[in-house]
Structures are given as C-alpha cells and as structure tokens.
C-alpha cells in the first residue's frame, strides 16, 4: 500500500515501483488506485440523502468508495481469477468512465490512495473542528462520524496487504499548491484562480483524516518518506 496527501507523488511512486519490478524481476505489477472506486455522482447523492448530510455529495472520504467492489477486485487478483476488470474514474466529469481496465496477470498488487492504511480517528480528534467546513457544515458531526465508522470496515481491505509506504508532507499548507498544480495538468491549463478557490474548499473534505494520518501512519508504516517544501524527498526511513 502507498498513501500520502494530494500531490504527494504516490501515483508516480507506484509507477516507478511497477517499472522496477518489471525490469529487474520480470514481475507483473497491478496498481489499484482507490480513486477509481469512487461512487458515481448519483450514488453519492443517494448516500447524502440517506445519511442526511450533503457533504457526501463530494467524493473523497471513506463511504464514498465502492468498498465491496474494491475488496472483490483484490480477492480476484490474489486468486488469479483472470481476466479482472477494474473501473476507471474520471475526476473531470466526476463519474466512472464507460470502459474498464482489463487485467490478465498480477504477480504483485499495489493499492494507492490518500486514505489507504489509515486507522479510525480517535474521539477527541474527531470532535475538534479543524476548518470552516466542519464548523459550519458538520456541527453535529454526522458526516465525520459516518466516514470514521466506515473506516473500520476499510480495515478489511487494508489487512489484505502486507507492506505500507507512507509519504509525509512538511505541512498541510503545501497541499493546496500541489493539488492546484496537479489539476492544472489534468485540465491542460496554465492558470485558473477560480479553480484554486474551489480546491481550497475541496481539500477541506480531506484535511482532518490527512492530518490524522500524518500523526499516526509514521508509527505503523514499513517505509516513511518525508518530503520537503519543493515536493522532493527529504528523508526515507525503513523499518
């Protein structure tokens, strides 16, 4: 498993590992991005209605993935039950693409994603409002309590993997700039101030769990990669 906040380079690292094992060990590596298993826009709206908070309209936190499908996909890959079809999520349209990715072989499986490997948040930290989104839109803690309870079920997925790499950022303030840079690339844009404002609001959905992981994941991961302010590797700690 590989985890890290937005813009930390977890997808790039996954690809590098895949190339390494193919070149030197002739192994077929399958990369599963937890992002590809997001629920559709309509499914999230139904979830928001069911849980009585429109915060679940926005993809991101646990609850907004098709966890059942993701676990089934991992199990099929492990059992060599090929071909295995993996969904592809389009973040621009905020929905799954019509076509899937077909996998015929898997010697190694990498699961990468921003919340991968996270343990549930403790009650004290969960209760604390760390941004305006929580303070204004989740005063009764309906949203954060629901996704934190869902995170308990996510442990069934995480426990299927035996190696955990965590990428730690120097500070949360860098996330918005790195995410902005990433999104400009996806949209082939040079600059978009409106997009930056939207991203500032968007990353608040990820802030609590990301900060919680920065506090807890360094103690449970197998490899800790610390980045500097320029997105460069500052330190690698093997455990």
Residue locations for each model-derived region?
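Hydrophobic positions on the alpha1 helix immediately C-terminal to the Walker A/P-loop
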Residues: 13, 17
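Post-Walker A helix-loop "phosphate-sensing" segment adjacent to the P-loop in P-loop NTPases
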Residues: 19-30
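Conserved NTP phosphate-binding and transfer environment spanning the P-loop NTPase/kinase superfamily
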Residues: 115-239
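Loop/turn-to-beta-strand initiation segments
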Residues: 82-84, 105-109, 163
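Short hydrophobic/aromatic beta-strand immediately N-terminal to the Walker A/P-loop
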Residues: 1-3
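Conserved nucleotide-sensing/catalytic segment adjacent to the nucleotide-binding pocket
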Residues: 30-32, 37-93
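Walker A (P-loop) phosphate-binding loop of P-loop NTPases
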Residues: 7
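Conserved lysine of the Walker
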Residues: 10
């Amino acid at each position: 498993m590989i985890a890290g906040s937005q813009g930390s380079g977890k997808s790039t690292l996954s690809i590098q590992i895949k190339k390494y094992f193919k070149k030197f060990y002739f192994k077929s590596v399958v990369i599963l991005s937890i992002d590809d298993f997001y629920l559709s826009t309509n499914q999230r709206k139904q979830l928001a209605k069911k849980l009585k908070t429109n915060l679940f309209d926005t993809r991101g936190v646990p609850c907004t993935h098709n966890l059942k499908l993701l676990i089934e996909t991992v199990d099929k890959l492990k059992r060599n039950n090929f071909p295995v079809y993996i969904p592809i999520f389009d973040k621009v349209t905020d929905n799954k693409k019509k076509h899937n990715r077909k996998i015929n072989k898997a010697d190694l499986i990498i699961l990468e994603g921003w919340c991968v490997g996270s343990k549930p948040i403790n009650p004290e930290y969960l209760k604390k409002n760390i941004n305006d989104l929580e303070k204004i839109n989740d005063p009764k803690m309906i949203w954060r309590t629901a996704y934190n309870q869902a995170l308990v079920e996510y442990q069934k997925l995480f426990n299927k993997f035996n190696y955990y790499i965590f990428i730690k950022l120097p500070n949360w303030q860098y996330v918005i700039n790195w995410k902005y840079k990433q999104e400009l690339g996806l949209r082939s844009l040079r600059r978009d101030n409106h997009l930056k404002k939207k991203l500032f609001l968007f990353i608040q959905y990820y802030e609590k769990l990301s900060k919680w992981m920065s506090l807890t994941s360094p103690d449970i991961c197998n490899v800790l990669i610390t980045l500097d302010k320029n997105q460069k590797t500052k330190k690698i700690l093997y455990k």
